[in-house]
Amino acid sequence: MLNKNCKVEFELNDRELLIFIKGEIDHYSAVLVRGEIDAKIAEVRPKVAILVLSGIDFMDSSGIGLVMGRYARMQNVGGTLVVRDPSERVERILRLAGIERIVKIEKGDKDDEK
């Protein structure tokens, strides 16, 4: 747990890293989440990292930076990044920023939710 407003959990399936982020992504929490995710990516070097955003209640522009930075990090380790299950509001923010041009945004199975 990062703070009372944001929590991150990981699940590794083969070379696929599921990253469950819950709560609010603002400037403060994005810094903490970024560090934790980057450390896990460096540790396991996944082929695919999936940001599961179904638990995000609020996201500002810091969330866009979080996604863009993890995209670059995955490119550096030869992997890909996927955003899964953002709420309508979060998906709208991501699409307004043009994220879907470089990162796949998908709707996943509800079985993947933690």
Per-region residue spans from a language model:
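STAS-like cytosolic regulatory interaction modules
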Residues: 1-55, 72-114
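Histidine-anchored nucleotide/phosphate-binding helix
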Residues: 67-71
